[in-house]
Amino acid sequence: MGPRAQRARSTLRKLRRALCGRQDSPARARTPENRHFARKCARTCEHGYAHTHTCEDTPAKEHGHLGEHECLRGHGHAHAYEERCENKHKHLHAHEHTHERHGRAPRRLALTAPLPLLLLPLLLPPMILLFFLSPADAKPVLERQVFWNHSEPRASFLTPPHGPGAPPGGPFLTAVGGDGTLYLIPSNSSNPPVCVEIPLPYGPGHENVITLLLVDGGPRTPDALTVAACLEVGVSLLTTNATEPTNASNSSPRLTGSCEKLRTWALGNPPFTRVCGTGGGTPRCWALSTNGSIHDLGLDGVGYSPPQHNGTRPLLCTNTSEPHLHSCEHTAWNGDHDPQRCTRTPLDKHGQSWSPQCHKSTAPNQLGTRPPLLITKMSDENGTDYVYFLIGGSGDDYPPLLARVCEDDCWLSGHWTPRLQTVLQTNVSCANASALLKSTSGNGGPIVLLVEGEGGNGSICTYSGLDTGKHFAHTPQLGETGPRDPLVGACGHNGDVPESLAKKAREHPDLKQTLTPSGGPVALPGLDPRHVTALGTGPGLLFLGTNQSNVFLLRMNDNGRPNGSLTLFWNGTGNGNGRAGPRGPVLGLQHSSGGGAGAAGLLAVLFGDGVTVLRTEGAL
């Protein structure tokens, strides 16, 4: 055997002891994968050594110079496999240490590593989870969009249809587009984003549709859906079959005059819709019935109390031309189910105004020169229902006052007292209230007021429903002979009232103690409170939509106290469909749970050109 073969033999023996004979044998490998590669490397090394021994046992004269080169090539081949095994071993060794870091660290690491390094593997997974669930980083996800062809700045959300006449696939987000089409958008995230379009009659330019409202199918039309359309040219009533919602037909004549406002008051049997606005410059209201009839009520109103006990109780409304309240009752139904008529009466130097046909009305300007703004209905701790509203304000002799009346009449000192003669008022510490936000839903929810500040900015003040009720119930009032006991009573039905008690009630006493907010003020930086749309989804959340397409979020606790400051929830961009970028003012907001077990919450944002639905799961 030549010198070169001897050197190769010596080198291979050293490699065998270093690689194939090391302690990391297949039996000591920690994982099945490592054991497999260890056995493969061992077989490769043994094959190389067997080839080397064959070359060594062959006489040099038998293989000569060529044979020696063949053996050396075999040695080199084995050496290459050994290097490959060595590299693979290093990779597996590092892989095993990776498993050790996620499981039990080696003893030598426990003796030398600092304590924070040892705790890092345990803390890393929770830190990653908190990072992804952080409210500051979580963003709403685009769920679906609906666009209409004509941008309409007066587009609005409507009462969703339900009952036997509603189309299948609900619940719905209902909106009217500027193209004169009604859109029923499934709010359930499990339903496909398919809209039901109900064309409405409109004039040239598609610009005369102001708003409209769905009315459930009543007993007379159980299989149909009635749509009350409020147009610039008047009021129209349409009835459509639920199975063919696109085949709408005009079932009643139009009335001249426009509808600037629309409020609802469904009476249950038969269902009614009250549409109020101006007709020929004169404030008026219409009652639209599902049987195809339209009643001219003639009452000028801009605000209504929320639906009361399924529409079976009187309606509280405010006057447009004269700042006072009316109580329109439905006690004068006749055999044809016509609603009570309202008559036009002279009001001295103030001219003529439409008033209800009952004595339950405050005197003109008795509540200030600004029309009262109805806020919400809440129950006190005794279960008595009250309607809250805001009166007075900047530029008036009256300061901003928060007032309330019984939803129905009040029982005071053993007598029934008309509710409009028992208006209680209290000062609020958030002065110069210029705009009103929706209160959060549910009894005891906070009253939310948006107040005007310097430089066009504004602030949010919240008033706990429970604290507000206690303030009205337990604050001394000012009477004819000075301070007297709090005016505490129960709400009930109509009854006769002694004139002496009614005279005291008509004083509308101011509560001496000012109602202070339970939370706030929370600044609205750079936001004009006159151009903010608000949506309260419960005691915990308040959404604000701006005229820059943004949606802000304010979190509150159960008492209505804000938790932190106003945060940007959605910037109004990234809408897709070639319409990325700002969409214009937010015209409406609606929030729903999405329906179904585990379904994500959905926030619908209404713009002039369509509706964007955001999935809020994980972002609230």
UniProtKB/Swiss-Prot annotation:
Keywords in alphabetical order: Host membrane, Host mitochondrion, Host-virus interaction, Membrane, Modulation of host cell apoptosis by virus, Transmembrane, Transmembrane helix
GO biological process: symbiont-mediated perturbation of host apoptosis
Topology in membrane: Single-pass membrane protein
UniProt main location, coarse: host cell
Residues spanning the membrane: 113-133
Compartment list: Host mitochondrion; Host membrane
InterPro entries documented for this protein: Semap_dom_sf
Assigned GO CC terms: host cell membrane; host cell mitochondrion; membrane
Role description: Plays a role in the inhibition of host apoptosis. Prevents host TNF-alpha-induced mitochondrial membrane permeabilization and reduces caspase-3/CASP3 and PARP1 cleavage induced by the intrinsic apoptotic pathway.
Stated name of the protein: Apoptosis regulator MC163R
Organism field: Molluscum contagiosum virus subtype 1 (MOCV)
Source organism phylogeny: Viruses, Varidnaviria, Bamfordvirae, Nucleocytoviricota, Pokkesviricetes
